[in-house]
Amino acid sequence: MAVPQRKVTHSRKAKRGSHLHLSIPTLVACKRCGKKITPHRVCNSCGYYKNKKVPQIEA
């Protein structure tokens, strides 16, 4: 079974995981009501997408 030959330092461990960070989601203002929404999604507050009313689907 493989065994580490040397201790992995904190800085080396941190460098390896540096790209695993969370990114801040992109937010844009809704053209209808001005609330912040993610792009290409229906607005939760007014229900519009590209200035068109999206019908509510009941599940």
UniProtKB/Swiss-Prot annotation:
InterPro entries hit by this protein: Ribosomal_bL32, Ribosomal_bL32_bact, Ribosomal_zn-bd
GO biological process per UniProt: translation
Single GO MF annotation: structural constituent of ribosome
Record keyword Lipid metabolism present: no
Sorted UniProt keywords: Ribonucleoprotein, Ribosomal protein
One GO CC term, this protein: large ribosomal subunit
Assigned protein family: Belongs to the bacterial ribosomal protein bL32 family.
PANTHER family: 50S RIBOSOMAL PROTEIN L32, LARGE RIBOSOMAL SUBUNIT PROTEIN BL32
Protein name, per record: Large ribosomal subunit protein bL32
Gene that specifies this protein: rpmF
